[in-house]
Amino acid sequence: GSAAEVFSRRKELPEIMPGVNPGVVTALDCPAAFLRAEQEMEFVEKNRLSCLTLKDEAYPSRLRECEDAPIVLFFKGNTDFNRLHVVDMVGTRRATDYGKQFCADFLRDLAVLCPDVLVVSGLAYGIDIHAHRAALANHLPTVAVLAHGLDRIYPYVHRKTAIDMLA
């Protein structure tokens, strides 16, 4: 059912959805949680963010296959998360010169072989940020997966790259 139905029938969730985490029922029965959800939605609207749920066709199909896939993805920008070709690049935060060069060369060559590939990484120091910069340099779409909320860019020094990714 809808989110409103889940909320209105929160006490019945264990019977309706066997295996539901009891913490979910407790959280739904907390007025502060409802207020927090309203604040989140205001933030989403104010900052022109988008969200996808597991039921949305545009939700990343590969991620949906994971047992612990997030129920909701918040994002900013425009991309097809279900592209045929996706490469995830993550690595050390203390990238060596060799690692940085390999990242640049790999994405340069990949852009020639597969120009529609989507590059996914974090926004952390090291290989993550180098992957995004190399993707941008090669005109490849790139997506940053953040471990924190969308209310800030961290590390802040990567703000320009994050803005460039949205252009």
Task: List each model region and its residues.
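Short, small/acidic-rich helices and loops at N termini and domain boundaries
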Residues: 1-57
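Glycine-biased, small-residue-rich flexible motifs in mid-sequence functional cores and linkers
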Residues: 45-47, 53-167
